[in-house]
Amino acid sequence: MSDMAMIRIGILIAGLLLVAAIFLFGRPKKSPQGRRVDKDEGQPRERREPVISSEFGVEDDAAERAEGVEQSELNLEGQDASGGNEVGKRPNQDFDKIVSLFVAAKAGQVLRGEDVVVAAEKTGLVFGHMNVFHRLVEGHPERGPIFSMASILKPGSFDMANIREMQTPAIAFFLTLPAPMTALDAWEKMLPTVQRMAELLDGVVLDDSRNALGRQRVAHIRDELRAYDRQHQAPPLTKSPRW
């Protein structure tokens, strides 16, 4: 299996778990499940985290489960998820749509933590809530993030104390809707940032299906977000009828 194929499988598993973790964190944790339950029993499958090898490929057991991986809560290993930093925290944890992109290292390479941090600062991202990076509304950080960026490797956060030792095959960018602006405007903020990050890190931009992001896919996402905005726009005000 090629390095890019392994990266895509890793993103498939870790990306889903990461997004769910960031927005489900803080809810009561479910009791750990001690065994894998057969589908015939009609019980939920055991939740397992992806196992990433030292070469940043997904090991066989996780690869076999890639197709059926669930969006489950990711264990943050007991650390304070916010690190005492509320910058980039969503004022409302409810969401109904997530749009994600990835910047992956080229075959045989990795993204170094120190380089990721420098690139993030150059593109206007700020370090904050959940120990990940966020793009905020200028002058209104209290409105929450326009989009966020995290590592695809467990636990997804950036440990600044050990950032020089950090390496990851890819980073994830996710736009969670509703956002502090229209969905289309938020996308137009995220896309050039992701593309610039890829340039700075000498990486490649992948879509949510782990394929190279192309013009056709970009156009399709824009159409989806226009439709989302139409569905969620406030109804027009009507005058009260005169009797």
Swiss-Prot record:
Briefly, what is this protein's role?
Essential cell division protein that stabilizes the FtsZ protofilaments by cross-linking them and that serves as a cytoplasmic membrane anchor for the Z ring. Also required for the recruitment to the septal ring of downstream cell division proteins.
Biological process, per Gene Ontology: division septum assembly; FtsZ-dependent cytokinesis
Q: Which InterPro entries match?
A: Cell_div_ZipA, ZipA_FtsZ-bd_C, ZipA_FtsZ-bd_C_sf
Region named Disordered: 30-89
Q: Which family does it belong to?
A: Belongs to the ZipA family.
- Protein name according to UniProt: Cell division protein ZipA
Q: Which Gene3D superfamilies does UniProt cross-reference here?
A: ZipA, C-terminal FtsZ-binding domain
Record's SMART domains?
ZipA_C
- Lineage top rank: taxon: Bacteria
Kindly list the places in or outside the cell where this protein is found, as annotated in its UniProt entry: Cell inner membrane
State whether keyword RNA-binding applies.
no
Positions of transmembrane segments? 5-25
Topology within the bilayer:
Single-pass type I membrane protein
Q: How does it assemble?
A: Interacts with FtsZ via their C-terminal domains.
Cytoplasmic-side positions: 26-243
The segments annotated as topological domain Periplasmic are 1-4
> What is this protein's gene name?
zipA
Would you tell me the Gene Ontology cellular component terms?
Answer: cell division site; plasma membrane
The biased composition feature labelled Basic and acidic residues covers: 35-50
Annotated keywords: Cell cycle, Cell division, Cell inner membrane, Cell membrane, Membrane, Transmembrane, Transmembrane helix
